[in-house]
Amino acid sequence: MGAYLSQPNTVKCSGDGVGAPRLPLPYGFSAMQGWRVSMEDAHNCIPELDNETAMFSVYDGHGGEEVALYCAKYLPDIIKDQKAYKEGKLQKALQDAFLAIDAKLTTEEVIKELAQIAGRPTEDEDDKDKVADEDDVDNEEAALLHEEATMTIEELLTRYGQNCQKVPPHTKSGIGTGDEPGPQGLNGEAGPEDPSRETPSQENGPTAKGHTGFSSNSEHGTEAGQISEPGTATGEAGPSCSSASDKLPRVAKSKFFEDSEDESDEVEEEEDDSEECSEDEDGYSSEEAENEEDEDDTEEAEEDDDEEMMVPGMEGKEEPGSDSGTTAVVALIRGKQLIVANAGDSRCVVSEAGKALDMSYDHKPEDEVELARIKNAGGKVTMDGRVNGGLNLSRAIGDHFYKRNKNLPPQEQMISALPDIKVLTLTDDHEFMVIACDGIWNVMSSQEVVDFIQSKISQRDENGELRLLSSIVEELLDQCLAPDTSGDGTGCDNMTCIIICFKPRNTVELQAESGKRKLEEALSTEGAEDTGNSDKKKAKRD
């Protein structure tokens, strides 16, 4: 489920727009970090992708924010660059664009950009750190060797005297055979453990600082927009369990200790030979002991294999785009056509005469079609609905750890970036649509969200003006926010939602007002309009 804050971050990134002149589409959006330690959602609100097309989208990142932000920044242009888009084939263009941006995430240039977004060190920086660490170790070893070279035998015996006593055979087992030996004695036997060489606990995965969104508030223009300011109370945490695992501990061994360890092993082998006779006399052979140890090792290895299967990130690359990814639901509006592409469990819903019409399909690993593809690619779905015990989605952009079957095309991998496409011809019955991440849909159904918005969209504020759409979204986010994190995680996720009206808001305003207007007000308004019209006619005749 990921880590949570002690108190939710309810700071919201919100905005409104009226659409482009040729395609008036009033919209409002809001995004909130909530209980999560970081914000991994992103979105696009682009009223004028081109002269006749608008684009609205939501990306729900996992394992970090980087892939979601990258998609928000580049996917609009990648869609427009597709050959099918230029030919007017929007469905094909969306499918090609999803696969194209997914493929770009494996290139070295994009991986570096993702690492910068995520705040992860690049390979070059890692190499520099390793070289610096090795230099420090070399300097320490040189100083130690120089010091010991100038010491007398008595001083050396004093320093390593505790290691010079012969250990009885029956108490020796296990000494000097550990994976992390301490300083070696003069006779080659292992000394006491050095606290500084204890195996460190597993480090957290790469941190990811949260942002409140990535949007375009411009009413005109085709760029994806700029990154919004981070909200307060942002946190840091490793990748969630759904897509990545903690890093394996790494312990550097100096050559000085390795050489000493080799000498210790030779001495121990000779002593082990002398111990075999005494063990045979007791009726318990070393061969039997070795067989038992082999069986134990086999059982431990099998347990380790199971653990690695449950945490796939341990074997995959720990780099952005491999252990992180994002859902994507993209809606294009051109004329009366609505085309929605979806990969993952974010969702687009249209209100049709007050009824919720799902324009996307949630992709879950346990679904029949998804399960068949996962198994065909060599994967499995665990009882809790996770692919190989990791990701609880079956389609996403990124997550290339799950896309390594070289015998299959990208769309047939365990996790596929190929979106489902739905098309709708808009009519007067279609009032608005909602695009949101699963932070909303896990709490409320499609119909519940439509009903909630329907009850608010005609409300007026204290000045008699229709409510801003963003204020309705903000209220929806607060409605979905869990009071605490004691439950199953419902209401504790990041939340991003966009409302897009298919009609200008002034039309909605007139419809809402007509039911409340008094007869006298209506007559006076009509009289004023007639006077204005007659004046215009006189002016024309003059």
Curated annotation (Swiss-Prot):
A lipid is attached at residue 2 (N-myristoyl glycine). Highly expressed in testis. Low level of expression in kidney. Also expressed in a number of tissues undergoing proliferation including embryo, uterus at pregnancy, placenta, and ovaries. It catalyses: O-phospho-L-seryl-[protein] + H2O = L-seryl-[protein] + phosphate; O-phospho-L-threonyl-[protein] + H2O = L-threonyl-[protein] + phosphate. Mn(2+) 1 binds at residues 60-61. Residues 26-502 form the PPM-type phosphatase domain. GO terms for cellular component: membrane; nucleoplasm; nucleus. Its EC number is 3.1.3.16. It holds the Pfam family PP2C. Its cofactor is Mg(2+); Mn(2+). Keywords: Acetylation, Cell cycle, Hydrolase, Lipoprotein, Magnesium, Manganese, Membrane, Metal-binding, Methylation, Myristate, Nucleus, Phosphoprotein, Protein phosphatase, Repeat. This is Protein phosphatase 1G. It comes from Mus musculus (Mouse). The gene is Ppm1g.
